[in-house]
Design a protein with these regions (language model features):
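Conserved phosphate- and dinucleotide-binding cores of soluble alpha/beta proteins
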Residues: 49-50, 56-222
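N-terminal active-site beta-alpha-beta segment that forms phosphate/nucleotide-binding
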Residues: 1-76
Length: 222
């Protein structure tokens, strides 16, 4: 399914475009399609080291995010997306960089298989919250007051919790029920010391959804 999804995404790319790419297996397939296709002068911006290395191995030009102010289109996966194109992007802990890439894109497209599409976000995944170190305890207490179970994310092979490339800790805030996704994201983002969250609300222009039978469905923003 991931390959079919990537093939549908490839058809949206034109010669000379500067595109944003996230991480994950579907993006790896998309890189292969770009490499095998007839497109010229494609440049890539990505927050993912694995994606950057894959592009380099296929001879695709990668430019730093800080040198770019706009992108023609950007593609990324997510943990879950709803029919209104609200998405949770908690897994990679690079959501701040991913949001920057999404904001620069004229069109931001999510690539998912049908198992990740829900009518309304269920929050089976926690909301990842990046915070400046000095605000760690304060932000944790504020999230707990909002009803979340909060933990500093840990990773295998590392002593202590996960830190971003910018040196900021990442908290996982688990919510049981959320009635208003946009309101939740605003409340968390307004806490002093919060850098960003993994909730993407009102950002995606469309989602390309791969079905088990090999077909793809495109959902446009309402």
């Amino acid at each position: 399914m991931k390959r079919e999804c990537a093939e549908a995404a490839y058809k949206l790319i034109k010669n000379g475009m500067t595109i944003g790419l996230g991480g994950g297996r579907t993006i790896q397939y998309l890189i292969e399609f770009i490499n095998m296709g007839n497109l010229d002068q494609i440049k890539v911006v990505t927050p993912s080291m694995s994606t950057a290395l894959a592009c380099k191995s296929h001879g695709i030009t990668v430019i730093p995010t800080w040198l770019t102010s706009s992108l023609d289109i950007a593609f990324d996966g997510c943990d879950q997306v709803d029919e209104s194109l609200n998405a949770l992007k908690s897994g990679g802990a690079i959501h701040t960089q991913e949001r920057i890439v999404a904001a620069m894109a004229k069109q931001y497209v999510l690539l998912v298989d049908s198992s990740k599409l829900v009518q309304k976000l269920t929050f089976d995944y926690p909301v990842a919250v990046e915070v400046v170190p000095e605000a760690f305890s304060y932000v944790k207490s504020q999230l707990e007051k909002m009803g979340a179970q909060v933990a500093w994310r840990t990773g295998s092979g590392k002593d202590g919790g996960v830190m971003t490339d910018q040196g900021n800790p990442v908290m996982d805030a688990a919510f049981n029920t959320v009635d208003d996704v946009a309101a939740l994201n605003r409340r968390i983002s307004d806490i002093p010391g919060v850098v960003d969250t993994s909730l993407f609300v009102g950002i995606a222009a469309k989602a390309i959804v791969a079905q088990p039978d090999g077909t793809v469905t495109v959902i446009d923003r309402p």
